[in-house]
Amino acid sequence: MTTETISLIRSSIKSIQDYPKPGILFRDVTSLLEDAKAYQATINLLVDRYKDMGFTKVVGTEARGFLFGAPLALELGVGFVPVRKPGKLPRPTIAQSYELEYGVDTLEIHTDAIVEGDKVLVVDDLLATGGTIEATTKLIRQLGGEVEHAAFVINLPEIGGDKRLEGLGLNVYSICEFEGH
């Protein structure tokens, strides 16, 4: 991973002040997606890191995790599994709830998407509190999958999600770190 590549990716991510509410500095990965060179560099970095680890599935969380997880899965030659909000998946699912700052949310996965012994890489765009990936990890493990790695484009380390996920036994990797919330 070169400093030049990281700089390209980092500079393609726009920061939006006071979105979605006052006091939040939002890191917008859609601007990265608009830059084909930065988007490809992001996928290439993830492929280089994970290509020889023997994963059998990549799981992406709704919704921006799909944008990085699906192309990564294709490049790794493995299946992609979406984890979605309730009612969005047509086959039988299991669900896992998790706490938000003000309330509770739930994620679902198809019951047949992960089989016993699958070696799973979890991917999302941004790591803040870690609640989404904790719930995703619990779903995968409930189905018998082995998950030890989680990859992100962005980490906000001040919020502490990386420590939370490390407490679950996950190796956390992020391409870029940004200060703030």
From Swiss-Prot:
User: Which coarse location class applies to the principal site listed for this UniProt protein?
Assistant: cytoplasm
Q: What CDD domains does the database record attribute to this sequence?
A: PRTases_typeI (cd06223)
**EC annotation?**
2.4.2.7
The subcellular location is: Cytoplasm
Cellular component GO terms held in the UniProt record: cytoplasm
Hey, which pathway is this one from?
Answer: Purine metabolism; AMP biosynthesis via salvage pathway; AMP from adenine: step 1/1
InterPro entries the record matches: Ade_phspho_trans, PRibTrfase_dom, PRTase-like, UPRTase/APRTase
A Pfam family recorded for this sequence: Pribosyltran
Q: Tell me the domain of life.
A: Bacteria
Annotated keywords: Cytoplasm, Glycosyltransferase, Purine salvage, Transferase
Query: Which reaction is the catalytic activity of this chain?
Result: AMP + diphosphate = 5-phospho-alpha-D-ribose 1-diphosphate + adenine
Q: Which GO annotations describe the biological process of this protein? A: adenine salvage; AMP salvage; purine ribonucleoside salvage
Gene Ontology molecular-function annotations: adenine binding; adenine phosphoribosyltransferase activity; AMP binding
Q: Which PROSITE patterns match?
A: PUR_PYR_PR_TRANSFER
Query: Hey, which family's this protein in?
Result: Belongs to the purine/pyrimidine phosphoribosyltransferase family.
Concerning NCBIfam families, the annotation shows: apt, PRK02304.1-1, PRK02304.1-3, PRK02304.1-5
PANTHER family, per database record: ADENINE PHOSPHORIBOSYLTRANSFERASE
Assembly mode: Homodimer.
Query: What is the protein's known function?
Result: Catalyzes a salvage reaction resulting in the formation of AMP, that is energically less costly than de novo synthesis.
Q: Which HAMAP family match?
A: Aden_phosphoribosyltr
Name the record gives this protein: Adenine phosphoribosyltransferase
Please give the organism.
Answer: Vibrio campbellii (strain ATCC BAA-1116)
* Lineage, uppermost ranks: Bacteria, Pseudomonadati, Pseudomonadota, Gammaproteobacteria, Vibrionales
